[in-house]
Amino acid sequence: MKFFVVIVFCAIFLSVSGDSDNMQDTCPTAPGEQSIFFINGYPCKNPTKITAQDFKSTKLTEAGDTDNYLQSNVTLLTALEFPGLNTLGLSVSRTDLERDGSVPFHSHPRSSEMLFVVKGVVFAGFVDTNNKIFQTVLQKGDVFVFPKGLLHFCLSGGFEPATAFSFYNSQNPGVVNIGEVFGIDQEHIKIMTRCLATGSGCRVTDGDEL
């Protein structure tokens, strides 16, 4: 009897915790001005007004602006920017890295991430809950996975700019930037990321050892 109760409980838990299946074939996000209520997600566009353009985006065709201190840019498309993704549990991003570019430690609380390198060399890694770091060098055509919620980073690892695309199993993965949480400036964040990635002893400009 106890075993039966446990089985029933597990079945109920899995059915509640899993994502719901789509109730219709498509559900492009409705424009903001048409939203009159708030839900966990985005309301669907009027079915009579859905077109093929709702499922196409050209926002990742061009490189992002890397003229900044980190010399990098991440362009993320969620269901808000790409209506056709709504209810599909997917999102996508493009990462552009200059020769010394970096995307410092951050996490996605609602999604895992699969990174696919299409140009250059990328040094990427993540830290698990045992504080163990997993890192590797990625070249064109290589794929690397960042588990859900774990801190991760990527750096340009070659002598030329690098480009990678990421795919997420959530239409809104969310981003937690460690530097912004603790008010650490970008210079220190960039140095810390490279120190952890290379395993070398580093010192920041004020002489404090990292």
UniProtKB/Swiss-Prot annotation:
Annotated ranges, domain Cupin type-1 = 58-190
A molecular function GO annotation = manganese ion binding
Q: What is its main location?
A: secreted
Show the Pfam families listed in the entry: Cupin_1 (PF00190)
Cellular component, GO annotation: apoplast
InterPro entries reported for this sequence: Cupin_1, Germin, Germin_Mn-BS, RmlC-like_jellyroll, RmlC_Cupin_sf
SUPFAM superfamilies for this protein: RmlC-like cupins
SUBUNIT field: Oligomer (believed to be a pentamer but probably hexamer).
Return the similarity comment: Belongs to the germin family.
According to UniProt, the name of this protein is: Germin-like protein subfamily 3 member 4
